[in-house]
Every structure is written in C-alpha cells, then in structure tokens.
Amino acid sequence: MDCAAALLPGFHPNYLLCPSRHFSSLLPKTDLSSPLKFQLQNKQLSLASSHGFSPVICNATLSDTYSETVELADIDWDNLGFGFLPTDYMYNMKCAQGESFSNGELQRFGNIELSPSAGVLNYGQGLFEGLKAYRKEDGNILLFRPEENALRMRLGAERMCMPSPTVDQFVDAVKATVLANKRWIPPVGKGSLYIRPLLMGSGAVLGLAPAPEYTFLIYVSPVGNYFKEGVAPIHLIVEDNLHRATPGGTGGVKTIGNYAAVLKAQSAAKEQGYSDVLYLDCVHKKYLEEVSSCNIFVVKGNLIFTPAIKGTILPGITRKSIIDVARTLGFQVEERLVHVDELLDADEVFCTGTAVVVSPVGSITYHGERVPYNEGGVGAVSQQLYSALTRLQMGFIKDNMNWTVELS
C-alpha cells in the first residue's frame, strides 16, 4: 500500500510505510562489466531490474499539510543542472543537549527560524551529508548506501560535540522525505534526487560552548551534473599555498566549515578557467589530499591508487564503493601516500563523490606545467568504473553488493 494512501483526513499518524533493504544474497552475482556510457545521464534508458522489497515502519509524523501528488513535477528534466530547486516537503527533528532525537516530522518546505545566537551561526557547529535517490523504470526508487551516510554523520557529530540520530532514525527519515517528494525524482536517465541531511546546533549560545538544542533537517532537490562540463573531463590546478585541512583538525568529517575554507582557492581557479582545485597536504606540501568536494584517484596500468584516509581527508562513500568495485573488476587498489609527481606519468586521473559519481580529469596544472590525460577524452578505466557503479545505483543490474535500498 502506498504510504500516503493509508492516511485519513484529520488524522496524524506517526508512521510512514517504507520498504526495507532487500536481501541481495538471494540474487545472482552482480555483473559489473557491462558497458554504460557516461552520456547515459542525458538519455532515456530502457534497462530495468526486479528487486524485491518489504515494508517496515518509519518513525516520522506527517504534518497536517501533507498531501501526495503522483505526477512528475512540471520542470525541464532535460536541462537539470546542479542547482537548488525547492520541493514540497522537508524533514525536521530536534533534541536538547544530552538527550536523544525522537518524534521527527515532515513539514512543508520553507524557511526555518534560528536565533541570531544559534551555535551553528556563531561557531559553525554543524554537519551535512549528501546522497541520492534514483527512479527505476518500474516506478520504484533506489537509495544508495544511506546507512553509510548515517554512520559518517554520527562520527562527525562526536567530533563536533553534537547528539546525532541513530542509523535507523537517519535512514527512516531519508526514506520518508524521499517518498514525500517523489514527484521531484527525475525520470530514468534524467538525473537524480539529491538528498541533503543537516545536523546543526540550533540553540542559542553566547559563550563558546556546545549549543543547548540541535536540529536534524533533511531537504531534497532534483539535480543533473555537478560540473558544468557535465560528464566531459574536468581540469584541475594544484594548490600548495592554501590548504583544505590540517592534522588534528576536522578534515576527516563533513563539517560545514570545511567547505567555506575552499571557496577562495576554488573561485580563483575558476577565474583562470579551471574546474576545481586539487589540494596538497599542509605539512610537506607534496602529497595529494583531495579536490574541493571530491576524492582523487590515479591510474597506472592495472594499478589504481588514492590517498589514504588519515584524518585530513573525507572518507567518501563513493570513494569506498569505487575501491570495492575496482577490486571486483580485477584492479589492484592501493590506499597510500600519493606524491604529486606521480601525476606526471599517470595513465588516468579521476574524482569521485556523491555529486559527481565518477568524474574523469582531462588535465592537471602544477607550478605552471599542464599534464593532459587521455587526449581530452574519457579514460577506459574511468569509463569502466563509472559504468559499473551507475548501473548498480540506477538499478540496471541486480545488486549483489547489498548497497541499494528500494522504495515503492
């Protein structure tokens, strides 16, 4: 039964029916080798998958303004960029310092009210996550590894002295928000619904201290490609004067302040015609860290290597998934220190992240020297990994990795 169909006028149930993770151990071995071109994001696809699913209860209260519209939103699905489009509903849940989150609810999307003395505004006490929902040809919806986002938020909350939702609360809230906004999920092959969970110190605090109250909020927006180049190769410049993170800092968690700190270098790079910035470590200034909002991978023959997670690099969920997919496909993958000079003779370089998935790098400029890759095209390894992961995310192959969560 569809979750909204069970609602009666005037009643305010405290649940939504949400399908649970399906058990991929019953499915055939995942085929990660079949091709799927980068250009498929801009074309209608005819592939489908038939996963099973079962209902579970989500602890979300529906506000009295909740209603359901089954038709797709009237927007230009063929020209989605990575910009914000307001949707219908957002999810809101609060708790006091020292207590636990409970009793979240779906509300009409709109502005929120914060004290000028809120901890998030004065001291940057906040985290965010990002994940996506995809529409399948049978009308069902796929989420990609939402429990990983929940776990990462919990780790970040501990670092930032904040309470956080449990993994189940986080995942159930994501499901509820996606289903409430399902008319905004792009048609197959047109994009995805970007999901943005926020955790912030919303209570008023004047002296430097953890906020007395916290808000967990989720909003969503339909999106296309993150980079303006779309799926064409991007061009990076290495930054060795400004740094994204420092040892002992917060570079390994998804705190909001990490991203404001990269805007100066990123803006300067874009003014020079580059897509983004590749940062080096702040101690030796010679080891790769990450791009402004993406992890970085280097390819040499059958070897793929990426900077190790050591406290200054965000443990990306797409990064983690690509490592597993690459090993499944027979590549040797190393997580280690990567010297900037290793870019000079690399076969390919690519970035990974929720927003970009896999983004091939066409060139990297370091100290005025431009190093091109793949003659301006998409490298074979980047293409293969992109194909394998997106086929799984979009439900075109059965998920033997047990990574997707299906909603009806």
UniProtKB/Swiss-Prot annotation:
GO CC annotation, single: chloroplast
Cofactor(s) needed by this chain: pyridoxal 5'-phosphate
Pathway participation: Amino-acid biosynthesis; L-isoleucine biosynthesis; L-isoleucine from 2-oxobutanoate: step 4/4; Amino-acid biosynthesis; L-leucine biosynthesis; L-leucine from 3-methyl-2-oxobutanoate: step 4/4; Amino-acid biosynthesis; L-valine biosynthesis; L-valine from pyruvate: step 4/4
Modified residues (N6-(pyridoxal phosphate)lysine): 254
Enzyme Commission number(s): 2.6.1.42
Tissues expressed in: Expressed in lupulin glands and leaves.
Additional notes on this entry: Branched-chain amino acids are synthesized in chloroplasts, whereas the degradation takes place in mitochondria.
Function: Converts 2-oxo acids to branched-chain amino acids. Shows no kinetic preferences corresponding to anabolic or catabolic functions, but likely involved in BCAA biosynthesis.
UniProt record similarity statement: Belongs to the class-IV pyridoxal-phosphate-dependent aminotransferase family.
Protein name from the UniProt record: Branched-chain amino acid aminotransferase 2, chloroplastic
Species whose genome carries this gene: Humulus lupulus
Gene name linked to the record: BCAT2
